Regions:
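Acidic, proline/glycine-rich low-complexity intrinsically disordered segments
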Residues: 1-278
């Protein structure tokens, strides 16, 4: 389920009808939120109402942006697609070359161009699509998940989770200066996704990488929590045994999430046993 929380509020509010929703994006006026639900893109008004289908999305999707002209542009394995926000059949507007992948679009003010990320041969760089001509301009600026700020900057994130701002000429679609670091340790994924949101005015919110790791806890029906006997680490998908006496859990070796193994925690004997060594 998706949630919305005002930056001046402490409590998130569930988005109605968003069960199973992923990859959310706001409409240009901020009154609607679109997202992927199952094998389709849908939208719902934040004020309430039914979930409305936009288009089929049977393959993977990698981010979407909603233009002021009420068109939605999203990235797929076929390239950049667009579809009316009112619903319809999506069409390809930019195809990647062999060995490339297009990800994480962001429309520029006025809708004339779209920024996005190009993955190619181990590199991650900024690119721009001129919607009037259909031409793709591959820039040499490293970085993923571009977000344009009306003051004339593009906010980018690198694979290590550092957020930077680069001066950008939105008319010429050119980077005009050096990158300036803004923050680091942003939670990232291998496909370039970032737990990062940027407003047009330049305010941004992000989720930091859990560099210190976490501990497993047990929570009873009354909400009381106690340590499950784990040390600090990077855990994934814990499962309780039927008798409730043991926990099986995957644990990554470190923050790079390169390798992981399965461990079993004995909640009675307070012991830990490693089952795999891959």
């Amino acid at each position: 389920r998706l949630y919305v929380r005002g930056l001046d509020q402490l409590d998130p509010v569930p988005v109605p009808g968003s069960d199973g929703g992923i990859l959310p994006f706001f409409s240009a006026d901020g009154q609607w939120v679109g997202f992927r639900q199952g094998n389709r893109l849908v939208k719902v008004a934040l004020a309430g109402g039914p979930v409305t289908p936009i288009c089929d999305a049977t393959g993977d999707t990698y981010g979407a942006t909603w233009t002021s002209a009420d068109t939605i542009i999203f990235a797929s394995d076929s390239g950049l697609m667009d579809v009316p926000a009112a619903g319809g059949i999506a069409r390809v507007i930019a195809r990647p070359d062999t060995g490339e992948a297009f990800r994480w679009p962001d429309v520029l003010p006025g809708g004339r161009a779209v920024l996005f990320t190009v993955f190619a041969r181990g590199t991650v760089k900024l690119a721009a699509l001129d919607r009037r001509t259909g031409a793709v301009k591959r820039l040499q600026q490293p970085g993923a998940y571009p977000r344009y700020v009306t003051a004339g900057f593009v906010v980018l994130s690198d694979p290590s989770g550092i957020i930077s701002a680069v001066p950008f000429d939105a008319r010429r679609l050119e980077v005009t200066g050096a990158a300036m670091p803004l923050a680091d340790k942003v939670s990232t994924a291998s496909d370039g996704d970032r737990n990062l949101g940027v407003s047009s005015s330049g305010d941004f919110a992000y989720q930091a990488n859990p560099s210190a790791g976490s501990r497993l806890v047990l929570v009873d029906r009354n909400g009381a929590a106690r340590n499950a006997g784990s040390d600090t680490g990077f855990y994934y998908a814990p499962r309780l045994s039927p008798d409730g006496k043991r926990v099986a859990v995957a644990r990554w070796a470190d923050i790079n999430f390169a390798t992981r193994d399965v461990w079993v925690l004995d909640l009675v004997q307070h012991t830990r046993t490693r089952l795999t060594f891959d």
